Structure formats: structure tokens, C-alpha cells
């Protein structure tokens, strides 16, 4: 009964536009959430690898192993560390390089005191 006046066509267009707007909003929210989860996972993996690298390098220093560098492959990435002497005899400077399997790289510098057995500085 309203077809002759053209009421149904504008209503269909309005409802279609509304549905597309809602679908667009939901898709944008989903993509944003997925990207956040991926970036958060990369952050936590990088932090974990850095902490493992610090523990490995400190163990290397305390056990007085030969050589001034080391590398360890983990399930989610790789850790490399280089140990340098500082002007203070008891302190060692350690450079860490971490790369995850997805390609993210992070670096950190720490200063470790052998006498007190504690970290003096951590810089990323």
C-alpha cells in the first residue's frame, strides 16, 4: 500500500546503512583488540627474554666462565649478551640483545656489582 508512494525503498536504504555502520564498528573493535593482544604478547615475550638474558649473563660473571659473550636460544626467541669490564674492578657492564621469533628486537645495558651481587643499573 505504501509502495506507490516510495516509502519502502528509503526505509530499506536506512536500515542497510545502519546495519553497515554497526558491522563496521564491530569489525574495527575486533581488529583493534587483536592488534592489542599481539603487541602485548610481544612485549611480555621480550621482557621475559630480557630477564632470562640478565640471569644468564650474571651466572656467567659469577661462575667466572671463559669468554666475554654468550648466546642462548629459547622457545620464543634468542638472547645474546656481551660482558665488558668497567673502570671499577668489581663491576661489569653487560650488553643484552634479544630477538623474538617474530622479528622484534630489544636491547638493554646493565651494570652488575660482583662484590655486592646486585644490579646497579638497567637501561633499555
UniProtKB/Swiss-Prot annotation:
Q: Which residues cross the membrane?
A: none
Q: Where in the cell is it found?
A: Cell membrane; Secreted
Its chief place of residence is: membrane
Query: What is the topology of this protein in the membrane according to its UniProt annotation?
Result: Peripheral membrane protein; Peptidoglycan-anchor
Residues making up the signal peptide according to the UniProt record: 1-28
The record's listing under Pfam families reads: ComGG
Q: Does the keyword Cell membrane apply?
A: yes
What InterPro entries does UniProt report for this protein, alphabetically?
Answer: Competence_ComGG (IPR020372)
Task: Give a short account of its post-translational modification.
Answer: Partial processing of ComGG in competent cells requires ComC.
Q: Which domain of life is it from?
A: Bacteria
- Name the UniProt key words of this record, in alphabetical order: Cell membrane, Competence, Disulfide bond, Membrane, Peptidoglycan-anchor, Secreted, Signal, Transport
- Gene Ontology terms describing biological process: establishment of competence for transformation
**Could you confirm whether the keyword Chaperone appears in this record?**
no
| One Gene Ontology CC term in the entry | extracellular region
Q: What binding partners and quaternary form does the record give? A: The transformation pili are flexible filaments, consisting mainly of the major pilin ComGC and smaller amounts of the minor pilins, including at least ComGD, ComGF and ComGG. Interacts with ComGC; the interaction is probably direct. Interacts with ComGD. Interacts with ComGF. May act as a link between ComGC, ComGD and ComGF. Homodimer; disulfide-linked. A minor fraction of ComGG is found as a disulfide-bonded homodimer.
Reported function: Required for formation of the type IV-like pilus (T4P) that plays a role in transformation. Transformation pili are dynamically extended and retracted, perhaps thereby promoting DNA uptake and transformation. Required for transformation and DNA binding.
The protein depicted here goes by the name Competence protein ComGG
Amino acid at each position: 500500500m505504501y509502495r506507490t508512494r516510495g516509502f519502502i525503498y528509503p526505509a530499506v536504504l536506512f536500515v542497510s546503512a545502519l546495519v553497515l555502520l554497526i558491522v563496521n564498528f564491530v569489525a574495527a573493535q575486533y581488529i583493534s583488540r587483536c592488534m592489542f593482544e599481539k603487541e602485548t604478547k610481544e612485549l611480555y615475550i621480550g621482557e621475559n627474554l630480557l630477564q632470562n638474558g640478565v640471569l644468564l649473563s650474571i651466572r656467567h660473571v659469577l661462575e667466572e666462565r671463559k669468554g666475554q659473550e654468550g648466546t642462548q636460544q629459547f622457545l620464543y626467541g634468542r638472547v645474546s649478551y656481551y660482558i665488558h669490564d668497567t673502570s671499577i674492578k668489581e663491576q661489569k657492564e653487560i650488553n643484552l640483545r634479544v630477538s623474538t621469533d617474530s622479528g622484534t628486537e630489544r636491547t638493554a645495558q646493565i651494570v652488575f656489582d660482583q662484590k655486592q651481587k646486585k644490579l646497579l643499573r638497567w637501561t633499555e
